[in-house]
Amino acid sequence: MWLQHLSLKTFRNYKETKIDFNPKLNVFLGRNAQGKTNMLEAIYFLALTRSHRTRTDKNLIHFDEEQLHLSGLVQKKTGSIPLEIELTQKGRVTKVNHLKQARLSDYVGHMNVVLFAPEDLQLIKGAPSIRRKFIDMELGQIKPIYLSDLTNYNHILKQRNTYLKSAQKIDETFLSVLDDQLVDYGCRVMNHRLDFIKKLESFGRKKHFELSNQIEELSISYQSSVNITDKQNLSESFKIALEKSRSRDLFKKNTGVGPHRDDISFYINGMDASFGSQGQHRSLVLSIKLAEIELMESITTESPILLLDDVMSELDNTRQLKLLETISQSIQTFITTTSLDHLQNLPENLSIFTIQDGKASVNGN
């Protein structure tokens, strides 16, 4: 798949911009704070209805406006798909083929993206919430039912936590009903994640082995607050975990176990990767991103769109060549950079856009 056209209206520092893209390589060139990353963020937001930079949607709206509008035309094997997002102070409206979508799971997945940015190194050493978000964003694109199950789980979780905080006297029967619903959707979420991690590890192990000159083996482990060793009895294990955590939950007035507390760990040759070098972290994250591309292709039969936010200057020649090798394989790619000096051995079929003061102009092919 590839993004043929993008229209931005009052998004970040863009008042109104319309731009047609190259199906292969697109380079956003410009000084810092001109809007290069904002352009990538717009593409990411159009795909996922979420920003990778802020949790507050109103930050995306131009400072002197009250709403924003994004639209794009995605080309896929099955044909053209128009996508639209309108964001106001009241919320967002999403459209596919000009038809309003009632659920997030009905919208996400029509345009798949893989983002690689400097902050992705936090995937290794950052908080568990960063890794959970990583799973949610990637898995949600290739498996819409996951977003539906996750939304339902979070809804029940919020109900349970609200009840724990507000109830003067706990009704054990009502709490048990909430627990049953939490277990139902929680097990679905965990099963989706376990399957995803298994596949990601398979693709990632191969990529990392190649990238490390065949001396490092990558493995990924899903760390759960619930006993997940026996998937057949996962529901029973979750119930037992909730029962054991009941006293703790009543005291702290929140839910201490479940997929909202889970994490993933990365290992290199059996050792915790968080203790590795900066170079190992870069290689590991690059391996994961390249694995994401292959995983998405294997499930959707479409190549995702690759977004590279100022990462080429962070990579040595070996890693750059590996990334460029992937770019050359018919994957539409967007790169931000302050200088073309950082970009070596680029494919010939590319478009360069100069970004200045929230405006984009084509200056090379």
Swiss-Prot record:
CDD domains noted in UniProt: ABC_RecF (cd03242)
GO molecular function, one term: ATP binding
Domain of life (superkingdom): Bacteria
Residues binding ATP: 30-37
UniProt record, GO biological process: DNA replication; DNA synthesis involved in DNA repair; double-strand break repair; SOS response
Keywords: ATP-binding, Cytoplasm, DNA damage, DNA repair, DNA replication, DNA-binding, Nucleotide-binding, SOS response
Signal peptide range: none
InterPro entries per the UniProt record, alphabetical: DNA-binding_RecF, DNA-binding_RecF_CS, P-loop_NTPase, RecF/RecN/SMC_N, RecF_2
Organism: Streptococcus pneumoniae (strain ATCC BAA-255 / R6)
Statement: the UniProt record of this protein carries the keyword Acyltransferase: no
Compartment list: Cytoplasm
A cellular-component GO term for this protein: cytoplasm
Protein name: DNA replication and repair protein RecF
PANTHER family the record matches: DNA REPLICATION AND REPAIR PROTEIN RECF
Family to which this protein belongs: Belongs to the RecF family.
Underlying gene: recF
Predominant location category: cytoplasm
Disruption phenotype: Mutant is sensitive to the alkylating agent methyl methanesulfonate and the DNA cross-linking agent mitomycin C.
Job description of the protein: The RecF protein is involved in DNA metabolism; it is required for DNA replication and normal SOS inducibility. RecF binds preferentially to single-stranded, linear DNA. It also seems to bind ATP. Plays no role in chromosomal or plasmid transformation but is required for resolution of chromosome dimers occurring as intermediates in the formation of merodiploids by transformation.
